[in-house]
């Protein structure tokens, strides 16, 4: 098997490089897409994993599993380097601000400090109370707004 050249470490975190080499680039395209922001919805990923040609089909033709609402707005961020208390999520005048920063820490190469700030324009009519954020065990931060029709 030929080696795969990975050009962007933000899109392909180091911890996944061995998996990509073992499975091949084509098999990992959906996993790789998680790190392009704003990310695809979880429903799109589930549809695509079930049938490889699902990305080419119209999204309205696929059914949503029962009990699983559609998200109008969703962001996936890889924040594995940060502790939950290092992450700040704010809204301001229709914008979602996500900030994270940690002080100097020791790693395998020496000392490092990291920080980032991301801004996303919220859809019209979205209020702070409509947002939910989940930090998954694998270091992925999911911020989303559920469809208001789901609550009715």
UniProtKB/Swiss-Prot annotation:
Subcellular location: Cytoplasm; Nucleus
Keyword match GTP-binding: no
GO CC terms in record: cytoplasm; nuclear speck; nucleus
Pfam family, one: HSP20
Record InterPro entries: A-crystallin/Hsp20_dom, Alpha-crystallin/sHSP_animal, HSP20-like_chaperone, HSPB3
Domain of life: Eukaryota
Domain sHSP intervals: 55-152
Segment forming the signal sequence: none
PROSITE patterns recorded: SHSP
General function of this protein: Inhibitor of actin polymerization.
Recorded family membership: Belongs to the small heat shock protein (HSP20) family.
Name of this protein: Heat shock protein beta-3
């Amino acid at each position: 098997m030929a080696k795969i050249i990975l050009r962007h470490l933000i899109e392909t975190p180091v911890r996944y490089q061995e998996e990509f080499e073992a499975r091949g680039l084509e098999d990992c395209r959906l996993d790789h897409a998680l790190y392009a922001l704003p990310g695809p919805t979880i429903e799109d990923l589930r549809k695509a994993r079930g049938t490889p040609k699902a990305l080419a089909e119209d999204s309205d033709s696929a059914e949503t599993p029962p009990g699983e609402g559609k998200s109008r707005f969703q962001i996936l961020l890889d924040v594995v380097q940060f502790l939950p208390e290092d992450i700040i999520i704010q809204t301001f005048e229709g914008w979602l601000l996500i900030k994270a920063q940690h002080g100097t820490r020791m790693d395998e190469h020496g000392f490092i400090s990291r920080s980032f700030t991301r801004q996303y324009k919220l859809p019209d009519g979205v209020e702070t109370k409509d947002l939910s954020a989940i930090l998954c065990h694998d270091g992925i931060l999911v911020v989303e707004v559920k469809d208001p029709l789901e609550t009715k």
